[in-house]
Amino acid sequence: MAAAAPASAGTKGVVRQVIGPVLDVEFPAGKLPKILNALRIEGTNTAGQPVALTAEVQQLLGDHRVRAVAMSGTDGLVRGMEALDTGAPISVPVGEATLGRIFNVLGEPVDEQGPVNASATAPIHRSAPKLTELETKPKVFETGIKVIDLLAPYRQGGKVGLFGGAGVGKTVLIQELINNIAKEHGGVSVFGGVGERTREGNDLYEEFKDSGVINAEDLSKSKVALCYGQMNEPPGARMRVGLSALTMAEHFRDVNKQDVLLFVDNIFRFVQAGSEVSALLGRMPSAVGYQPTLGTDVGELQERITSTLEGSITSIQAVYVPADDLTDPAPATTFAHLDATTVLSRGLASKGIYPAVDPLDSTSTMLQPAVVGEEHYKTARAVQSTLQRYKELQDIIAILGLDELSEDDRRTVDRARKIEKFLSQPFFVAEIFTGMPGVYVKLEETIAGFNQILAGELDHLPEQAFYLVGNIDQVKAKAEKIAAEAK
């Protein structure tokens, strides 16, 4: 039996006021739309040009009026235009049909590849999974990337903050993670572009096609769906596009029972968009001008990203830190939700060590003996203490030279340099421009390899043999090749 249509569906109202992206609409008495319902406004402006936009109801004002936020530009909108209550929240297409496609906040394809033949749509607003549905046992999410798996392991169904400036390899790291989850875990990914540059969104799409993550010939074989609300969009779109991407990811988790990767770039822009419309909605600004509902807004998004008994959504969120101030309310609120942080270092990138993940600054709540095991924990801490000692000695080396160090310190420096090189690895998605085949390294191989370096079993091998390889067997093979070439 078909469900009854909502009582307010199809009710027509009239636009009474427009202030930037915020508009007031008057409806007949007793037929007001519900909060978060989508309103559809279509008509022609004074110049005879067509105007069509969707707005989301945010407040009921009294006097039969509602206040709504537009999801696209309000140019040409005039008072007296008709607004139709759709009777439901904004809904987006979900399922396999979304793979390989680019959507806007309303779930409309924007890649000129024709309509999307999705068998289902889902509303972008829903409650987080119940406590009884959650997977409570912490489980490490293996990425196949040595530096992450060893020193800052990701939690399955957890949230990771990705910190890094321009040109240090954020995009390549994201692509590799998408590639690895598809090949090793049979999972798919959803990318939410929130308030970042349109050029970057286009570049990412082209790079996904080049690396095979999006199969241009057969879109059904693609491994990622893209949802963009870039920085030229009104704040309404930037405020909701993260939820549109999350809704697509939730379908893969709950219906297809898959492990999903959700990328959000950039989570700060989601907060920023909320603060832009908050004052227009008549709310009193809070600390540093942010919306008073900051904690709730972030919490509603983050609490839906989790592991259930059916599947998981593991989220990697790029975090922009305004003026490098970690105490700013936006990043500070985000940090409370993160299980791990992956910090990309310009210093490592300039040395040619990729992925340029900083082994000392990156952290994870999973790195504890009860979760990862005693051997993994001890190896990770020994690697970090060796690298920390090397960092402390660098000033002495720069002034006095390596020869002035004690025998022990020289050995530490030698091993630390090998560890630093061994933390690099060739990526599958970078094969096209490095010419080196990518490597997925199992966690056991990673731990065994670093243990051998720390124990001094590989002190006789040249440092260069550890650079851009997978496991220790490849190190030994590379060392033999270097020795043969030197003869």
Swiss-Prot record:
It is an enzyme of class 7 (translocase). It catalyses: ATP + H2O + 4 H(+)(in) = ADP + phosphate + 5 H(+)(out). GO terms for molecular function: ATP binding; ATP hydrolysis activity; proton-transporting ATP synthase activity, rotational mechanism. Belongs to the ATPase alpha/beta chains family. CDD domains: ATP-synt_F1_beta_C (cd18110), ATP-synt_F1_beta_N (cd18115), F1-ATPase_beta_CD (cd01133). This is ATP synthase subunit beta. The keyword ATP-binding applies. ATP binds at residues 164-171. It is found in: Cellular thylakoid membrane. The keyword Membrane applies. Its main location: membrane. Its EC number is 7.1.2.2. InterPro entries: AAA+_ATPase, ATP-synt_VA_C, ATP_synth_F1_bsu, ATPase_a/bsu_AS, ATPase_alpha/beta_chains, ATPase_F1/V1/A1_a/bsu_N, ATPase_F1/V1/A1_a/bsu_N_sf, ATPase_F1/V1/A1_a/bsu_nucl-bd. Produces ATP from ADP in the presence of a proton gradient across the membrane. The catalytic sites are hosted primarily by the beta subunits. NCBIfam families: atpD. Keywords: ATP synthesis, ATP-binding, CF(1), Hydrogen ion transport, Ion transport, Membrane, Nucleotide-binding, Thylakoid, Translocase, Transport.
